Amino acid sequence: MEGRNPLNNGRSSDDKPNSDGVKPRTPTSSYRKLRRELSKTKLRIPHIWLRHRGLEPSDVFLASYPRSGVSWTRFILYEILTGEEAGFAAVNAGIRGVGRHTLGLRALPKNGRLIASHEQYRKEYKRAIYLVRDGRDVALSEFAYTSALEFFHGDLDQFLRTFLCGKISGFAPWHRHVSSWLDSPIAETERLMVVHYEDLRQNPVQGFTSIAEFLGLDVDPKRIQRAVTNNSLEKMKKKEVAEPQKASMKDRFVRNGFVQGWRSKLTEQQLEFIEQHAGSVLARLGYPVFSQQQAAVHSRPALQRTSSLS
């Protein structure tokens, strides 16, 4: 149709969310919904400041953009640190998020804590592991997650516009978040370790061995192998199902953990739109960039042209 927005996907105007792709509905969790919305307001600034009190030089941060595989990573690291079986309660109590870190597990050298954070780089972060995942897979995972929890009610095209503007959550657009870490004062030093989620998935034992070395841990290789085996995505899903507070499927946090799912889930128009915003950061991280591969399109798997997450 002439003049049609290529990122519209034909959604009727009668069922159209607002400009941010968000339609008011009864949320799955009123508290979670309120907390998410407040994170996108100016109240976030003093709240972040308060959350970063009580940090110590021996603390190490496990930082990531949401939906980058940090839950799986935390489970394995918890078993590496403690030698104990990782369950949701134990992991959440041991490797706590920033703001809840006071009572976190002190299992690092010099009595340090491993603290999780979804924030952009901050000067308080003196030493960190930055877990990064292909932004296209992050977007697909976040779309599935926020749609299931009724935080977002638009289609995938509307979601991508909102996601790339940083309006899905209070953590800034994916590409800006990544750049804040890659361009930080601790980048290119021994105080920052950038880890690709895809590398961890391909060779988890080697990847977590390197992380343990970065943390200054002397760990038996058998413990690392056991931690990886005990926390496959399939086993984590079973652990989550056993959690009493996970009453319904849409409350599930552990999903597929796919790698390069974007190749079959995103259309060429959607890929081009993403790369207009984040292409340079994707390339900087070493991820394949669609616009740079037009001439070599026959040398890689063909993109399946689909407009929805099926």
For the regions a protein language model found, what residue spans apply to each?
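A short coil-to-beta-strand element that immediately follows conserved catalytic motifs
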Residues: 88-91, 220-226
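C-terminal anion-handling pockets and recognition modules
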Residues: 225-232, 271
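Short, glycine/acidic-rich hinge or "gate" loops at secondary-structure transitions
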Residues: 222-227, 291-295
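PAPS/PAP-binding and catalytic site of the sulfotransferase fold
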Residues: 69-83, 194-219, 227, 235, ...
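Short acidic/His-enriched helical or mixed secondary-structure segments at domain edges of catalytic enzymes
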Residues: 229-250
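PAPS-dependent sulfotransferase catalytic domain
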Residues: 2-195, 247-248, 253-310
